[in-house]
Amino acid sequence: MHSLINHNEKNIGIFLFLIFSILICSNAHSDQSVESIIMVRKALFSQNYKTAKRVQSLSVSGNFDEAKNLMIEMSKNYQVLLELFPDNSKEGFKTRSLPIIWEDKKLFNALMQKSSDDMIKLTSLIESTDDPKGTIGKLMWGNCKACHSKYRVEN
């Protein structure tokens, strides 16, 4: 009987440790400071813009391998951005994000996912298209424009 009690105490301890660990991991972004979240997402959007300009330049000049690597990098950045709009980051620290992002989070997330998917799609189309600039305009710049026109404060 004594070993059964010890066994149950051990199981309860393990269970509580696992629950505590899950709670800690799931709150990782909420514990992160609002400022750092906003700064990281601003940096990623800025990086994607710079990378997009480079993608266009490389693609138009026929350097498709390097352009494809950058497209994949941009796609990954959009995936990261999906996690960088928690409720506690709606305002402050010169964010240029509009409240509509949080009001219709599913639509915003769908656009970020589409942007990521379109960059991957672009890697398979860029070499075979007759109009690299037009294809890039549709699959890359079109998503940038859609996001800026709906979710970003105007300049």
Report residues per predicted region.
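The canonical Cys-X-X-Cys-His
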Residues: 139-152
